[in-house]
């Protein structure tokens, strides 16, 4: 990726709401991150030149109030990256996404592959 640029964002905030079992709080936190952080970020980068990857280190479903082995949502976005049709950024939709199920150590390599294919 010598000529590629990418930004990786690790989401931690929603995890706390998962531990509290607060699904509404978790959803609102993700919406706030989307509006305040990503809204600002996307206004200030050239998405034709920069890809953005969003993920976390584990799933924390509200129903469990703890960490689980559910898939962790991963979003990779940029003008040159094709949408896989996923409509929501959730553990459930992560199971159905085009990226598939990966081990944690495979995520960055898969992201680089997807970004390069977008060229």
Label the predicted regions.
Residues 1-119:
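Feature captures the catalytic ectodomains and active-site-proximal regions of enzymes
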